[in-house]
């Protein structure tokens, strides 16, 4: 049996191991297409700001082709470094594209104010054609859908600090798009707006340079459909992380945005580890979880073997991402989601509409959290040096805290209450029919007389005698009644008092034509 278990563990490890690269065959290269990336040909701030202005206009032009749009975005993304050309050549290793760099310098003879650097060749016409300044109609289209503030005509500046603020504002809006461009583009607008508000409050961006929605939609769609652009952005993030010492302010902002980008599309895997394993509830000892726990262990080892690109496997369209989907461990994932819903309020908005979702194990996770509330782990307590007295104190405090949390989040348990609408009277309500209606009225009258003559204790017995013998007990209240008869008697007495009071109010109001009606809308207001 021990040999079988060792073979099983070895089989699981080899099954999820990535293929080993061998030197027998050459690298597979695809059919490449050329991407032209304009970069500044000098260190002048005027050149960079003018190039940034032209590229933003170019991206806003709806007639721009896909490769040209990718080249413009790569040019903007690399503008914050001192040598954009060296950066692009160092980090670019894409089998699908061939990047050609074009140095751009200032020119007074071109309509765009820029020209391509060349040795004795006039390139103003080519520069105007690239930046779409050869046609006035195209120029007007490029201006449409630019910044939300229509008073901004251009973003050409000569101050390095001002240029960095404008460039950082534009780059922040582009980088935020990468977080959900692949995984959830339909719901990305809300999260992108929250990031924008955050960086505006931190004074990292300038609110006046908020780009228009359709400009951002164009960039988001291009990021979603172009793998080469995403490869460049991920390579740039990793290159910034490897940089030692202090980084430029824009680079630090990119690293901050990376916290929203990293592990995109891996929520099922990460949350299963967080809520299913790290919580260490005893439910992990179930036999049903044994195989899936072994699968998760193999996936965690595989994640580490992939190295620094593992958190970006979904963004990079790595085929190995399918192994990390929740379909590989459905029971443990369903259990972890139940734990997460009880522990964190933010988990309540997750979509569990999967074909492999198991409601039974989801409820198991919820019950484990509810019944384990206030309990202290003996293993962790011994490691931290927590005494038994301290553990009891912590359990007592945690129980009260959990009760307060439940009361605030869910509210008190209430019976179902029906209200009358303002346009209805008692006569207009649906009746039970002849015999049933008379039986109910007779029961109410006898209950009122019994309450007046014998008091609450005998009235409850009288009401019990009038109950139908074939009525099944309420599943929610039957266990409580069997456990505590005194509480059941008090509840019955309270119900009889309410019915008696209702009967008295009916007799007092019989002389009036219009009965008092309670409207649920008025109560809610």
Swiss-Prot record:
Residues spanned by motif Nuclear export signal: 425-440
Residue ranges of the region described as Disordered: 418-525
GO MF annotations in UniProt: RNA binding; structural molecule activity
UniProt KW Cell wall biogenesis/degradation keyword: no
Chain spans, region Homomultimerization: 1-36, 373-391
Residues with PTM Phosphothreonine: 279
Keyword Phosphoprotein: yes
Comp. bias (Basic and acidic residues): 433-452
Superkingdom to which the source organism belongs: Viruses
Record localization: Virion; Host cytoplasm; Host nucleus
Chain intervals for the UniProt region annotation (RNA packaging and organization of the helical nucleocapsid): 1-375
Keywords of the record: Capsid protein, Helical capsid protein, Host cytoplasm, Host nucleus, Host-virus interaction, Phosphoprotein, Ribonucleoprotein, RNA-binding, Viral nucleoprotein, Virion
Binding locations of RNA: 180, 195, 202, 260, 351
GO cellular component: helical viral capsid; host cell cytoplasm; host cell nucleus; ribonucleoprotein complex; viral nucleocapsid
Processing and modification events after translation: Phosphorylation at Thr-279 is required for the formation of the nucleocapsid.
Low complexity biased stretches: 468-479
Xref: InterPro entries: Paramyx_ncap (IPR002021)
Region of interest called Ncore, as start-end residue ranges on this chain: 1-400, 1-403
Region named Ntail: 404-525
Principal location listed in the UniProt entry: virion
Motif Nuclear localization signal, chain ranges: 70-77
Ranges for region Interaction with the phosphoprotein: 477-505
Assembly and interaction partners: Homomultimer; forms the nucleocapsid. Binds to viral genomic RNA. N0 interacts (via Ncore) with the phosphoprotein (via N-terminus); this interaction allows P to chaperon N0 to avoid N polymerization and non-specific RNA binding before encapsidation. Interacts (via the Ntail) as N-RNA template with the phosphoprotein (via C-terminus XD); this interaction maintains the P/L complex anchored to the nucleocapsid template during the sequential transcription.
Function: Forms the helical nucleocapsid (NC) in a ratio of 1 N per 6 ribonucleotides, protecting the genome from nucleases. The nucleocapsid (NC) has a helical structure with either 12.35 or 11.64 N per turn, approximately 20 nm in diameter, with a hollow central cavity approximately 5 nm in diameter. The encapsidated genomic RNA serves as template for transcription and replication; encapsidation by N is coupled to RNA synthesis. Forms the encapsidation complex with the phosphoprotein protein P. Before encapsidation, the newly synthesized free N protein, so-called N0, is chaperoned by P.
Similarity comment: Belongs to the paramyxoviruses nucleocapsid family.
Name of the featured protein: Nucleoprotein
Organism in which the protein naturally occurs: Measles virus (strain Shanghai-191 vaccine) (MeV)
């Amino acid at each position: 049996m021990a040999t079988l278990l060792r073979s099983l563990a070895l089989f699981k490890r080899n099954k999820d191991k990535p293929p080993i690269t061998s030197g027998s065959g050459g690298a597979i290269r695809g059919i490449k297409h050329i991407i032209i990336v304009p970069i500044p040909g000098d260190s002048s701030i005027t050149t960079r700001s003018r190039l940034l202005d032209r590229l933003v206009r170019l991206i806003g032009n709806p007639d721009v082709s896909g490769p040209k749009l990718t080249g413009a975005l790569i040019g903007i993304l690399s503008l914050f470094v001192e040598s954009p050309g060296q950066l692009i050549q160092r980090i670019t290793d894409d089998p699908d594209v061939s990047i050609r760099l074009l140095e751009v310098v200032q020119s007074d003879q071109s309509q765009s104010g820029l020209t391509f650097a060349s040795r004795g060749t006039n390139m103003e016409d080519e520069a105007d054609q690239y930046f779409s300044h050869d046609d006035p109609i195209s120029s007007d289209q490029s201006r449409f859908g630019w910044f939300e503030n229509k008073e901004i005509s251009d973003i050409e500046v000569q101050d390095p600090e001002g240029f960095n603020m404008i460039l950082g504002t534009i780059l922040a809006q582009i980088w935020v798009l990468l977080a959900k461009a692949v995984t959830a583009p339909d719901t990305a607008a809300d999260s992108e707006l929250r990031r924008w508000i955050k960086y505006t409050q931190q004074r990292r961006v300038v609110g006046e340079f908020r780009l228009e929605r359709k400009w951002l939609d164009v960039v988001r769609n291009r990021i979603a459909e172009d793998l080469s652009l995403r490869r460049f952005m991920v390579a740039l993030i990793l290159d910034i992380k490897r940089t030692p010492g202090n980084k430029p302010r824009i680079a630090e902002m990119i690293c901050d945005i990376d916290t929203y980008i990293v592990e995109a599309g891996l929520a099922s895997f990460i949350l299963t580890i967080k809520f299913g394993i790290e919580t260490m509830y005893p439910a992990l000892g179930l036999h049903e979880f044994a195989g899936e726990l072994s699968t998760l262990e193999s996936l965690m080892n595989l994640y580490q073997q992939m190295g620094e690109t593992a958190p970006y496997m979904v963004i990079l369209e790595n085929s190995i991402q399918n192994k990390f989907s929740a379909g590989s461990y459905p029971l443990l994932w369903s259990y972890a989601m139940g734990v997460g819903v009880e522990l964190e309020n933010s988990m309540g908005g997750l979509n569990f509409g999967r074909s492999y979702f198991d409601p039974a194990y989801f409820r198991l996770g919820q019950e484990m959290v509810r019944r384990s509330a206030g309990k202290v782990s003996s293993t962790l307590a011994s490691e931290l040096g927590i005494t038994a007295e301290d553990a009891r104190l912590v359990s007592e405090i945690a129980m009260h805290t959990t009760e307060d949390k439940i009361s605030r989040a869910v509210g008190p348990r209430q019976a179902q209450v029906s209200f009358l609408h303002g346009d209805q009277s008692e006569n207009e309500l649906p009746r039970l029919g002849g015999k049933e209606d008379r039986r109910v009225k007779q029961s109410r009258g006898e209950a009122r007389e019994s309450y007046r003559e014998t008091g609450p204790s005998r009235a409850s017995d009288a009401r019990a005698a009038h109950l139908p013998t074939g009525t099944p007990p309420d599943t929610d209240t039957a266990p409580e009644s069997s456990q505590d008869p005194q509480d059941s008697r008090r509840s019955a007495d309270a119900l009889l008092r309410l019915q008696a009071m209702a009967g008295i109010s009916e007799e007092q109001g019989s002389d009036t034509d219009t009965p008092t009606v309670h409207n649920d809308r008025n109560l809610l207001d």
